[in-house]
Design a protein with these regions (language model features):
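A generic structural signal for short, well-ordered alpha-helical segments in conserved domains
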Residues: 13, 17-20
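Glycine-centered tight turns that cap/initiate beta-strands
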Residues: 22-25, 152
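Short beta-strand/loop segment that forms part of the nucleotide-sugar
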Residues: 1-8, 29-30
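Hydrophobic helical membrane-anchoring modules
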Residues: 141-203
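Acceptor/aglycone-binding surface of glycosyltransferases and processive sugar-polymer synthases
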Residues: 18, 25, 29-33, 37-47, ...
Length: 203
């Protein structure tokens, strides 16, 4: 069990170290500051050693009860079992609106599959994890990378669950920047638009 602490200041590291004293199978990677979700996920995958790897948030918005079913699909030959929310219960309406618009836009301009409501909660084989780690992008957009590497994936749906404790650090500006990273990383549309505008100014 590997915890990734993204520069928290709420005593998380102290509590995890207590767990480590009780169980040697528990480990932690603690960042010196907040580097963001993408860096945390990459560090977790890089430090993982098992034949199968599960990524999940610790706020319990990713239901652990799905794990048995996820492994059943892996035994049936899937390389990855991914999850998506079919509702956005408890989420601000404006955030839900822009999230839906983002996924709709990506379907139009990108050749890489990105499911609406996709979560980072996912079970993967070691082969898929290694493929993801081989991509050393500086500005990572893991939701796109999952689709780009092309492994056989089963999708499980569930209704959104409100976080058990705490508040999200993702404000509108951070979500906008993250969305722009996804658009520029997995679509040629921005480049084509820039080229077209450049040609117009040269005429």
């Amino acid at each position: 069990l590997l915890y990734i602490d993204d520069g928290s200041k709420d005593g998380t590291v102290r509590e995890v170290k207590k767990l480590i004293e009780q169980d040697s199978r528990v480990h932690i990677v603690s960042f010196s500051r907040n580097f963001g979700k993408e860096a945390a996920m990459f560090a977790g995958l890089e430090k993982s050693k098992g034949d199968y790897v599960v990524m999940m948030d610790v706020d319990l918005q990713d239901p652990p009860s799905l794990l048995p079913e996820m492994f059943e699909w892996i035994w049936q030959g899937y390389d990855s079992v991914a999850t998506r929310r079919v509702t956005r219960k408890g989420e601000p309406p404006i955030r839900s609106f822009f999230a839906r618009r983002f996924y709709h836009l990506m379907k139009q301009i990108s050749q890489t599959e990105m499911m609406d409501g996709a979560r980072d909660y996912r079970l993967m084989t070691r082969q898929m994890v290694d493929a993801i780690l081989s991509m050393r992008e500086y500005n990572r957009f893991t939701k796109g990378i999952f689709g780009w590497v092309g492994f056989k994936t089963k999708w499980l749906e569930y209704e959104n669950v409100e976080r058990a404790k705490g508040e999200t650090k993702w404000n509108f500006w951070k979500l906008l920047v993250y969305s722009l990273d996804g658009i520029t990383a997995f679509s040629t549309a921005p480049l084509l638009i820039a080229s077209f505008v450049g040609v117009l100014f040269c005429i």
